[in-house]
Structures are given as structure tokens and as C-alpha cells.
Amino acid sequence: MAFYSAVEAVLGVTWLSALFTLGSLSVFWLLRHRERKSQHALHNAWAQISAFDPSSLDRSKTADDWKTTRLGKATLVSNRYAHEIRNDERLSFQLGLEQDFLTTVPGLESLFGGTFHNGIVWDAAMHFSRKLNTVVDPLSEETIEYLQKNWGDDKEWHTVPLHHSMLMLIAQLTARLFIGEELCRDPEWLGIATGYTMDRTFAVKELQQWNPRLIPVVHWFLPSCRKLRATIKKARGFVDRVRTERKQKKTTADDTNRVDAMTWIDSVARDQNCSYDATLTQLRLAYAAVHTTGDMMTKVVAALCENPEMIEPLRKEIISIISEHGWREAALHKMTLLDSVLKESQRIQPLGLYTLSRIALEPITLDDGTQIKKGEQVKISTDHMWNSSIWPDAAQFDGYRFQRFRDNPDQSSAVSFVSLSANHMGFGYGKHACPGRFLAAIEAKVALCHLLLKYDFELENKEASAAQTEGVMIWRDHRAQLRIKRRVEKIEW
């Protein structure tokens, strides 16, 4: 960070940044034109593979006979190749991320801050996956605190913003597990954890409008990139303070009362005699977890509002299982209807329109003769998630769909929310699938148990909250309002 500050000082970034801001205004029309062109290319790609309006989310009529189509500079590949491509070492996962997220630019490097960071974040996710029973109580505690403070006990209908509520709830839950009790309720830290992701996304989008050869210079002056570096500096103050306080208290990873990634990662780093950037690691964890899980929660709550007949059966399942098995991870696994609802919501509205982004390291010929050129970026389409030849009545939300599949021996191995298959790639597919999906599932289930038992809720305006596409992403309208009121609980937590 001192190096970056020195560079900015030597280059006189303050006035140059102002100049770039003015210049940005003069070329605004060009950037908007490129964005519209990119959107048009995306819609053309979907039009080539589908017999429906690309702006619609009803993809039940997706064609089955397409193989590849262009998506900007990348090649969109049919799901038929998912199993073949998923673990092919000739297709680089790392380079795909670098191209999509510009991970080598200062201020953007939190996604990959060196090989140790790559491994340690993966290890952290795997660590939590093996100790999920220890996170249920902390997650429940934070959910109770958040809902009490932000949703309240009012038994009359009142409104809260759907997406913002889910985002900040998940931000607090993940902060409890990633950085600990010291900061998980701190508004400034939660602002950093949520804001950095969106600011980073905007900076990448802005940088990608420039010639790649200019990016190593341009990023020093663009206000969006400077803002990210300032955010990292601010985050560093929070993280360094917590680490210093813990060292003074001689807190170790063996402290059974502490369950958070920072404590555990510090321990691993000491064991491996490695140094690492704790701040960038925390931002990377937040980048990977907060908005993705918040988006998932937004969509499943909206789906329940649109399918209210699912709410009472879910409440009965939750009450029955917790009453018999207690409030622990094993009980959450027995909630097969809740699990099915989560998986169905993700099938109907996954995070985006493609997954498995890769860069070819050499010319590749797939089994059917399809050619992939060296250096070409390929992405697997998610259109199969809405294909009626795979999913009966694919356009319809069926909360019982995956619960029914559990009784079918041919389908039972891939029905849980966290399971992976070529036909449902909500968490990716292959060895690079989301390592944090087990933790995300526990977070979502804990939060939903509290929401369902403590509150009645409904969308204020179903039309205004409809799902929509923005570029390659599938969103719920962030302006949607949720009407809520406190209800009488029928269980003791």
C-alpha cells in the first residue's frame, strides 16, 4: 500500500484524476455505446440458442441442438460439453478469472493476492465445511440480533427493502464467521464488506472499456480504481486493529470459544511459516460470499412470496425437526423441503447466464470435433436450467421438485442443495466449483428458519420486483419492498 501511495504521489494523481473525470464525461457516450453493444451481443447469443425473447426469464423452450455461439470476445458453449470441459487442464480457470476480473490491477488484486492467498481461502472454506456444526449457534445469534434491530417486533404490516435487508443480514453473518465478533456488527466494516464488491465490479467494468495495453497506466488515474485503493487502506486499519488486540490477548486458533476464519488462517500461516495479507484475504472472502449469498436469499424470499403455499409446509418441517433434533447442523440437513426450495430457487434464477469461464492454453478438439482455439475464452451456458426436456414444467417454480427426486435412486445423488451435476450448475461444476457452498447453505437455512417462524412477509408489488437480466447477471429488482409483520413463534430457540 505504501508503494501505491508513493506512485500516486509521484504521478500527481490528484489533478490527473480530475482530468480523467472530465475526460470520462466527454467519452461517456462511447462507453454507453459499448455497453449497449455488449448487451446486444449477449441478447443475440441467447437468440441463437433459444426460441424465446431474450429479455424473458421463461427459458423452457430452449433449443437442444446448438453447440457454440459468440458472446462478445468469448465463446458461449452448450451445456452438453460441461462434463468434458469441467476438469480439463488445458482450459485455465485462473486465466479465465484474470480476464473477467482483472485480478492483477492494484486495488483489484483482493480476488487473487498471490498463490498463498489462493490456497488459504480455499482451505478456509474447506475448514468451515468440516466444522459446520460449530457455526450454527453464532449464525443464529447474529440472525436474531439483526432481525430484532432491523425488522423489529411490530405486529402491524410495515415495509423493508428486500435486497438490502438480505444483503446486510448475510454481511453480518459472514462477518461473524470471517473476521469475528469484534467487527461483525460494526456499520463501517459492513459498509466496506458490501461496498467494496460493488465498487470493484464497477471499476472492472470501466477498465474493460479501455484498450488492454493502456490498463496498467489508466488504473492509476481512474477515480473508481483510486476509490478501491482507498477502501483497502481503510479496511487495513480495521483488520490490523483486530489482529493487534488479539495478539495482546494472546488469542490462538485453539481458543474453542472463537470461530472465525481470521483466527484459523493466522494459525495456518504460522504453521506454514508464510506471510500473507490479512486485509486482502478478508476482502476476498467478503467478495466471494456476501453478494452471492445475499442475492440467493433475495431470490428465495421473493420466490416464497410468489408461491405462498410453500410457507406453511416449511414452517411445519422446521418446527418438527428442531423440536425432535435440536438446533444444530444435523437438524438443518434433515430439512429436505427447505433444501429443495433453495435448490429450485437457484435453478429458476441462478446468479447468471453462464458459468465455468476458462481460457484455452492450447488448441483443443472436443469429442464431437468442436474446435477451441488457443487463447480463446469459453463459458458454459446455464440455459439447460430452464430446459423442459431435463426439468418437467421447467418454467414453473416447484418447491417439492428436489424433495421428490430423493425417492428416485437415479436422481437421489444430485438432489441436495450443495450437490453438483451437469444439469444444475448453480454452484459451478468440477474441481473449481464453489468451495463455500456448504457454508452458504447453512447460512441460508439458519436465516430462513428465523424469517419463516418469526415473520409473515409478502412482496409489496410483485410486478415491480420481477426478475430481470443485466448483462450476464440475473437480478431481483433491488428497489423491491417486502411487507413484514411479527408473528407468534411456536418454538424456543
Swiss-Prot record:
Enzymatic class: oxidoreductase
UniProt-recorded name of the protein: Cytochrome P450 monooxygenase esdpG
Any one Gene Ontology molecular-function term assigned to this protein's record: oxidoreductase activity, acting on paired donors, with incorporation or reduction of molecular oxygen
Species this protein is from: Penicillium shearii (Eupenicillium shearii)
Biotech utility: Shearone derivatives produced by this cluster are interesting candidates for Alzheimer's disease (AD) therapy since they moderately inhibit aggregation of amyloid beta 42 (Abeta42).
Annotated compartments: Membrane
Membrane topology of the entry: Single-pass membrane protein
Key words of the record: Heme, Iron, Membrane, Metal-binding, Monooxygenase, Oxidoreductase, Transmembrane, Transmembrane helix
CDD domains in UniProt: CYP503A1-like
Similarity comment: Belongs to the cytochrome P450 family.
Entry function: Cytochrome P450 monooxygenasee; part of the cluster that mediates the biosynthesis of shearones, diterpenoid pyrones (DPs) which are structurally diverse meroterpenoids consisting of a diterpene linked by a pyrone, and which may exhibit a range of bioactivities.
Record keyword NADP present: no
Residue positions binding heme: C434
Main location: membrane
Transmembrane segments: 10-30
GO biological process: one example: mycotoxin biosynthetic process
Cofactor(s) required for function per UniProt: heme
Name of the gene encoding the protein in the UniProt record: esdpG
Pathway(s) served: Secondary metabolite biosynthesis; terpenoid biosynthesis
Pfam families: p450
Superkingdom to which the source organism belongs: Eukaryota
GO CC list: membrane
EC number: 1.-.-.-
